[in-house]
Amino acid sequence: MKHRNFTFDKTSYLQLSELGSKFNLSFSSHLVLGNKIIGLDGANKRLLVSEINDGYSKSYIIELDKVSAISVKKTYNSIKPGELNKRKFEEFLKTIHLQFEFADEAETILLPFYENETDNIRDLPRLERNAKNWQLILSKIIGAQISEVAKERRQLLLTD
């Protein structure tokens, strides 16, 4: 099993490198998440997401310049009365996503970090920590640009 994961990681990193070259990206951070690998090009404010399913790969780039907010979104299964006496709260957790909201509000992208159907609950603390860390890093990147937009708007208001 470890050998298989190592092969996937090696293949993923090779694919990330090739895609980075193809799209002229230079990654400052990256992370393997199950069948996905994400790479951050902080200088160009782009996040590459590459996913491998059944031997086919699908990749897309999130332009962080167009993102207005990034949050960690958790969804839970329904909890019936008395179930919390038998099971821990985190056992009801269904997914943890990094949610990207765009300035034009036309689109929202959900990047899964934890899915209870495919991920082991023992990995939950690590995956949740990863989601929060990436949310913090990416929010700082878009925060600088949002601050610039706010300054420009204030300048426009002052000149009117």
Regions found by a protein language model. Give the residues of each.
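Generic detection of short hydrophobic beta-strand segments and adjacent strand-loop junctions
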Residues: 31-33, 60-62, 109-111
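Short, surface-exposed coil-to-beta transition loops
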Residues: 33, 57, 93-96
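Residue-level detector of beta-strand structural context in well-folded domains
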Residues: 36-38, 60, 98
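Acidic, Ser/Thr- and proline-rich intrinsically disordered linker/docking segments
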Residues: 70-160
